[in-house]
Amino acid sequence: MFYLKINRDHEDDSGNSLPAGSWSVSLPGTTVYAKEIDFQVFVQRYQYLHYDAEVNEMVNKSVMAKNLYPQTEIPDMLGTFRCGSVPASQRDTLSADKALQQKEIKCFRMLFGKATFIDAVDETGKKVEDAVDVPILWRARGSNFMPISVPMDALTAQKKPFIFYKLRASLDKKKNGGLVYYVGKFDNAPKLVDFTPEDQDTLAYFMDYINGENTKVIKEYDDSLRKQGRMVDQEATTVTSDDVLNDDLPESLTG
């Protein structure tokens, strides 16, 4: 599995010119860039991360949950929920330090799937022909958190599991003062594709990854509660760990 990213740079450390505003993925021996990709989402999850940029350190992270409903408990490694994230509407009463800390806590849309890079090139501008069906994880946040939900929610509303469709994705250039950033733009006409035995294996890998990640976080959560002298509801945490995994997958894929 590789990480899908948005390249904002015009040049790399070696002085190579890069296509800013392109999708990118670092593969063994090379980094691939493309203005457009075909993206087939297999699994969608949500995870809170608390990252302290000053010390370049991950402070806390939550389990990967299947939704963000207010009633959904999303435990984290420090024995709290959602890394202590407080809704923006409720932050007026926070101290200055606590309010600043809230800016370090981000919610990510974790999108596991495969991507085919269209008219792909490497860092030297050479064409790359084999960046096809690359298993990827895209951690979308900020301005990129919502756009992909439009075609995915449309499929869900039609009772069409998004796992069986691919989306053509490009990037829109945006400006906020002197800041330039790029936002994913997704075709609203997803294409139905075959779900192959190889795809089933890739899905199993993704689910194992999510399960492993959640198991580690739940263990840290339980350990934190014990250190604080708080009761641990073992049954509740077990249900949380299991239920966030696969109850949104088509029955044909969960056996």
PLM feature spans:
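OB-fold ssDNA-binding interfaces and closely related basic DNA-contact patches used
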Residues: 1-129, 176-177, 181, 240-255
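Extended serine/threonine-enriched, polar tracts that run as long, contiguous segments within proteins
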Residues: 107-192
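Long, compositionally biased interface segments
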Residues: 153-255
